[in-house]
Amino acid sequence: MKRLWQHCHAATLKGGKYSIVEDAALVTDGPLIHWIGPRAELPPGDYAERIDLGGAWLTPGLIDCHTHAVFGGNRSGEFEQRLEGVSYAEIAAAGGGIASTVRATREASEEELLASARKRLEPLLRDGVTALEIKSGYGLDLASERKMLRVIRRLGERLPATVRSTCLAAHALPPEYAGRADDYIEHICSTMLPALAGEGLVDAVDAFCEHLAFSPAQVERVFIAARELGLPVKLHAEQLSSLHGSSLAARYRALSADHLEYMTEDDARAMGEAGTVAVLLPGAFYLLRETQLPPIDALRRHGVAMAIASDLNPGTSPALSLRLMLNMACTLFRLTPEETLAGVTLHAARALGLEASHGSLEVGKLADFVAWDIERPAELAYWLGGDLPKRVIRHAEEVYRG
């Protein structure tokens, strides 16, 4: 069934630029974009429905390409402790930090995790997110990682959004493997990944390469295991120190390397040559009061596509707004509004391996788009909050109206 969407303007994001079409029209056929361009050039057609968008601006549906949205409990108490001067190390030594989230996640039922994640994700979806990634990594044993990944798959079946599932078993060392990191990595590679991938629960594999997590050599073992299973890889890298994890990610043609505050010029060059996307996470940078900025100019010099994500998680980025991350990326990292919009559309799609079907308004791609109550695209990075979407459309069907 063909529908005509008209009386609008469009920022198509073709090629990662605004690529603006004034006085635009868009034709959908089933779930796909059939035609888009200036309304004056609209070819004759027989449309089952004509939708007047009232002068709204259209963009591709937003994509949140890095979240940890499934977890048990929350850590608002630790937030208060940090503000009172208690260090993260002291909190962790008392059983807090990621260990507390692991305990709460292991104890929670699948239904409890599903309900809490849906509640967290609702604000993102209402604000224009039509695709997202969710990572495991708070289970850290086979049964609990399976539980998390099952919840992620169920969210994909129930939410009006495309949901990609990433196995992050190599997120932290579980307590039962204290002092035995190599043994845990072996368990991930020989037991967890084959089992979880065999059950169809995994779209990609991630790891955390950092002094407080896993070494580049240990991460490489995970990458090799993922490659043997035919799974793409991603990496948390260079958030707190420089271990050149982003270069390792590039060597394995990773979909993305994320955080990147401490990456070097050589790391950026390697990522550019490999086509690995840099996923910037300003929410975590802000909440941790970091001062080391990711090297944006180096990423630009080497042609590295920059995506932006919420990093929604209970410890370092309890962010329920992807649009707020656009403002933070402009204000804290000095990206342009155009770069940030590309970062939550086309480049975010690339970071999930979805660029053939998502991320820009082009013929043949899925008709996932948002009609915004704005006067120019830069407003999406300008306004802090507010109910800006007039309509959120997924697969040519309205899923939210403002």
Curated annotation (Swiss-Prot):
Name the keywords, alphabetized.
Cytoplasm, Histidine metabolism, Hydrolase, Iron, Metal-binding, Zinc
CC per GO annotation? cytoplasm
Q: What is its main location?
A: cytoplasm
Q: How is the cofactor bound?
A: Binds 1 zinc or iron ion per subunit.
Gene3D superfamilies linked to this entry: Metal-dependent hydrolases (3.20.20.140), Urease, subunit C, domain 1 (2.30.40.10)
Q: Where in the cell is it found?
A: Cytoplasm
Q: Where along the chain is Fe(3+) bound?
A: H66, H68, H236, D311
For molecular function, the Gene Ontology terms on record are:
imidazolonepropionase activity; iron ion binding; zinc ion binding
Q: By its UniProt entry, which HAMAP family does this protein fall under?
A: HutI
Under PANTHER family, the record lists: IMIDAZOLONEPROPIONASE (PTHR42752), IMIDAZOLONEPROPIONASE-RELATED (PTHR42752:SF1)
State the protein's name. Answer: Imidazolonepropionase
